[in-house]
Amino acid sequence: MKRRRFLHGGAAAVASSALPPFAPQGVPAADQNPPSWTLSAASARYVVRLRGAALTVDCFHPGDAVDRADGAPSPPDDAALVAVGPARRPVAWRVAASRQADASNLRLVLSADDPPLIADVVFAIDGATGLLVRDTSLRHHGIGAAVDIVATLAVWCAIHEPIDSMLYLAGAWAHETQLQHGPSDGALRLESRTGKTGFEFQPYLALRTPRSTYLCEIFWSGNWILQATPQPQGAVLRGGLNDWRFRHRLDAGRRLALPSVLFGRLEGDLNAATQRLHDFRRARRPDPDRPIPVQFNSWYPHAGEPTAESMLALVPVARRLGCEAFVVDAGWYRTDEGESAADWASRTGDWRTSHVRFPNGLREVSRACRDHALRFGLWFEPEVIGPLSAIRRAHPEWMHHLDGKAPAPDQRAVLNLGIPAAWQHAFDRVTRILSAVGVDWMKWDFNADLGAGGWAPGLPAALTDQDPLVAHYQGLYRLQDAIRRWFPELILEMCASGGGRLDGEILAHAHVNWISDQPGALRKLAIHFGTQLAHPAVVCNDWLVDWPPGDTAATAADADGIDERGDLAFRLHVAMLGSFGISARADRWAAADFATVAAHVALYRDTVRPIVHHGDQYLLTATPPADGNGDWAAIWYVAKDARRGVLFAFRLASPETARVFALPGLLSAARYRAAAVAGPVTVLPGSALAAGLPVTIERPFQSALWVVETD
């Protein structure tokens, strides 16, 4: 979560059990290659074609003639699936094998002789959502010289409907995921060159037509690129790994997995498409049915310097609020060489408990949490090594060398998880603490920019032939999975100074992600609207922070201070839009405020959480402006069985005290009890609620939370 001292500078395969296996075949003559393959979903038809160096997908309305693909735009030179060598020569392919079990699944094996490469490609339409997922893996034939891969494409897709608008997410630290509208007459290029998913853009794009929505999402946590180029009757999308300073050498028997890419044409508006995306992403999460506990986090009450005394004082407070987990954030550790008065950022990497801060060890706090029926959580930054770390001096070769340079002695460094010994160090140190202390929740932070990454000199070629970021992130995903295997009940939360590394791949290996270091509720409301276009609410972790107003220091990104508008209920309702927690000096709250928060925690746990985490989301208004000077904002979540829903309504600067919100997704003939928190109950049929529920909010910067349940 902490943004300071920044460094500058393989994707999970979709399940394909329905596909019958096929044996590798010899490379046939070119005239044996099938020209195209067609995949069909309820709202889309996809034509896959091999065009020399390019493997393309043309997407149509299911009623359109398939042969319109013959008029599709020809792929340009940079549409090649793979380019090799300093000259970036496109690789020409032919089909070595194919297997299409049905209209939803396709496997291709493509082969090239010069260079000696094979591409294994799987297209699978998800039966539950109709979304198409492509997985691509490159491997060396086994005969011939090593191949220097310098560019790849994980997707090239042509859309054959006129596009009304292109929607994407852009931002900065503490101002993530602001909804943007792309140009209608020029190419849109989204990318990261920071060595992580990035604050600047999300690897997400939505394109709207009068009758449909197209979605594209790249599942990758390192440098990526996603481009959209409007055409007279549609658009072309291309993307995958960013080829900026990319080089990956494949020797005989070596393999490179490209990022998984999700794509789809879906009938209806953006809400309908987002619901299907959320369904897919929820199913891809670890332990998708496990509730995310309401947590109390120590960062804002005791930023960077927790102690046994301060934590033990807050544990019973968290319990009285109704929280389910208590997480000790950064600062609990020392280095192998002993105690230090240096700040939390300088001491990361060795992961030894500080006995100055915790004289009886962390186990004392863990036991106190158990005694109060709380899970115990602990913050780590496994990849980032502080300048005081002993392991850094013992093994400088384990650190990323950006631009070929060793990290400066007084700066933080990044442990290269592509190095097996470095990976093992991180695994051993983290799991030792998790086991010894009894940790149920691990918060995994990453306060660094990696650029293109880099290898230390003198490492074996078997390592340095790999692109350093590819090696690092494949190691990261393995480390996430290994820790969860060792501790199957553990909740794994990811963070990168907020939403700096928030993507569909890192969240295929973790449960939840801290979405922003932004402490202001008004700005955070806009961040929720944007983030929840690309990610389901269950993975979006947020806290009640700045209460009472002015109690929290502003981030450097908000030099003018935190916008203090919004009462306590408003701030609670914003934080309850995803997974929910508290990080504030609750021990100093007035009794009435404490009771208000405790009541909201109980309501969230018992009623709101299962609907928000697993239901369909409808954005009922436009994204509110980050400065709060907008009209109204509203989000409606409805359970999959259509028997329950929750409405969050926020009055911003609007002079109007009332709005009517249509609540879709309910059973027309069923009768529902609808009530705002602490308000009277109204009984209405689903058809009446679909026509509109009147909501009154008396003052600006107040909110209402309505619960709707079958009578």
Task: List the predicted regions and their residue ranges.
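Aromatic-lined carbohydrate-binding/catalytic grooves of carbohydrate-active enzymes
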Residues: 293-368, 372-425, 441, 458
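C-terminal beta-strand-rich structural cap/linker in extracellular carbohydrate-active enzymes
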Residues: 686-711
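C-terminal segment of N-terminal export signals and the immediately downstream linker at the start
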Residues: 20-38
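Glycan-recognition surfaces
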Residues: 386, 391-424, 470-587
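N-terminal export signals
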Residues: 5-25
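Carbohydrate-binding surface patches
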Residues: 624-668, 705
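Polysaccharide-binding surfaces and accessory modules of carbohydrate-active proteins
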Residues: 33-50, 55-229, 244, 671, ...
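Short Pro-Gly-centered flexible turn/kink motifs
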Residues: 248-266, 702-708
